From Swiss-Prot:
First-listed, main subcellular location of the protein, grouped into a coarse class: nucleus
Record keyword DNA-binding present: yes
Organism: Aspergillus aculeatus (strain ATCC 16872 / CBS 172.66 / WB 5094)
Biotech exploitation of the protein: Secalonic acids show unprecedented anticancer activities against various human cancer cells and might be interesting for further derivatization, targeting diseases such as cancer.
Organism lineage string: Eukaryota, Fungi, Dikarya, Ascomycota, Pezizomycotina
Name used for this protein in its record: Transcriptional coactivator AacuS
Length: 429
């Protein structure tokens, strides 16, 4: 329980953060729309890339700290009940594509929406009004529904809805099934092959479909969206760690990004370093692995029209790196996939590192960058990353019986990869 001094300290911290936020988001204070992005909160502006972002995150952190400090058992239970119902409502709205039926500007009759999707009007009213309690949608007048800034963002950026649907369909059922999975593993059923079967059962139970060519790509897309937006896994998009490219500014050096799951990082870096050549290697879709016919379909290289210096090609994970004259190799941290991954993250990473030994031997000046998540050491505390780290850790446990290696383990792994002619050396972390 907070004492008076602690409460006053946290209150001052919150007020200071709020002051910073209002200074960086004037349009949200005076009610103007200048600088606002459609589908975003008025506190999010086109310039929210630095101080404004940090100020908003600080406000949310302070509020969360106060809530944890002041909440009692009843508050916690009511909050969990609310979040459960909100997730159920969001899944329902997504299943029936309700957000897409509502114009981004203006409103729609709830009766018309109900007729369009074929559900009772009273049913959709009850769901919409629960969602409104969290700022998702709004009812400008009785019987009409309109987008709020929050719900509009789920339309303008479908990845948010992908993350929410995976959370509802896959993550939550698996999390609630954790006691029975623990009992099975404790009883000696912890072999990875059994875990893969369990994961397939979880996914098939929730999706009512097998992991075929149609279902698997969608599931992969939703899984990666959930990891990015639901667990704070930003390894695939972070660019601030790629400081080694500064020395190649103005040259025509080649940069290879291995295991990319999106083009976000490549496009950001291409804009920052317009003379560099970027080769983006995407892993073969899981549905194509092991099938010669399907693999041939992906055996091609394509250019990105908007960025002439970016080319994309497919590559099977762990195969020897064929681009042997690059200045920099960016290795994306491998991620498990429920029901598909057959070896641990550490094993996948070691295989990928060994696949690059020959390329680095031929180009001794080349640099290899591993984009690892910000996983704290055991016992380390930090409210900024601790919650998301624990969410991600449990998601890996429940869905793939895996975990992220700690920083010390990664360094030991890197130092241990080599052959008779040399080994990796960590020069910066």
């Amino acid at each position: 329980m907070l004492n008076l001094a602690q409460l006053q300290s946290q209150t001052r911290e919150l007020l200071a953060a709020l002051k910073q936020l209002t200074e960086h988001c004037p349009s949200a204070v005076d009610g103007t729309t200048e600088g606002m992005i459609p589908g975003l909160s008025p506190w999010s502006t086109t310039g929210e890339s630095g101080e404004a972002t940090r100020a908003r995150e600080t406000v949310l952190k302070c509020l969360a700290k106060l809530q944890v400090s002041l909440a009692g058992p009843i508050d916690v239970l009511q909050h969990m009940a609310s979040q459960t119902q909100l997730l159920a409502c969001l899944q329902w709205l997504g299943e029936f594509q309700v957000p897409a039926c509502i114009p981004l500007d203006g409103s729609a009759s709830i009766k018309d929406v109900a007729e369009l999707i074929g559900v009772p009007e009273n049913h959709i009213c009850r769901i919409v009004r629960m969602a409104i309690t969290a700022g998702f949608l709004q009812e400008p007048e009785l019987g009409h529904v309109a987008h709020s800034p929050l719900s509009a963002a789920f339309v303008t950026n479908p990845s948010y809805l992908d993350a929410a649907m995976f959370l509802a369909r896959i993550t939550t059922p698996a999390a609630l099934n954790m006691p029975s999975i623990t009992r099975q593993r404790t009883a000696g059923m912890c072999e990875r092959v059994n875990q893969v079967e369990q994961n397939n059962n979880i996914i098939n139970m929730v999706t009512s479909s097998t992991l075929d060519e149609t279902a698997l790509p969608r599931l992969e897309r939703q899984w990666y969206a959930y990891l990015r937006f639901g667990t704070g896994n930003l390894c695939d998009t972070a660019t601030d760690i790629i400081s080694c490219l500064n020395s190649f500014q103005g040259t025509s050096a080649t940069v290879v990004e291995v295991g990319a799951r999106s083009l976000d990082r490549a496009m950001t870096l291409a804009n920052r370093y317009p003379t560099l050549r970027f080769i983006i290697q995407i892993h073969l879709p899981s549905s194509a692995s092991g099938s010669g016919k399907d693999e041939a379909k992906y055996d091609r290289t394509r250019a990105i029209r908007s960025h002439s210096q970016i080319t994309v090609q497919y590559r099977t994970p762990g195969t020897p790196q064929q681009i042997q004259d690059a200045a920099v190799y960016i290795i994306n941290f491998p991620l498990p996939f429920p029901g598909v991954s057959s070896c641990s993250i550490s094993a996948q990473l070691e295989t990928e590192l060994r696949a690059h030994l020959q390329a680095l031997r031929l180009s001794p000046a080349a640099t290899l960058v591993l984009t690892a998540p910000a996983l704290p050491e055991r016992g380390a505390r930090g409210t900024e990353v601790a919650v998301l780290t624990r969410i991600r850790d449990l998601s890996f446990l429940q869905l793939a019986n895996d975990r992220e290696p700690e920083i010390s383990e990664l360094i030991n792994l890197l130092n241990g990869v080599g052959d008779s002619e040399g080994r990796f050396v960590v020069v910066k972390k």
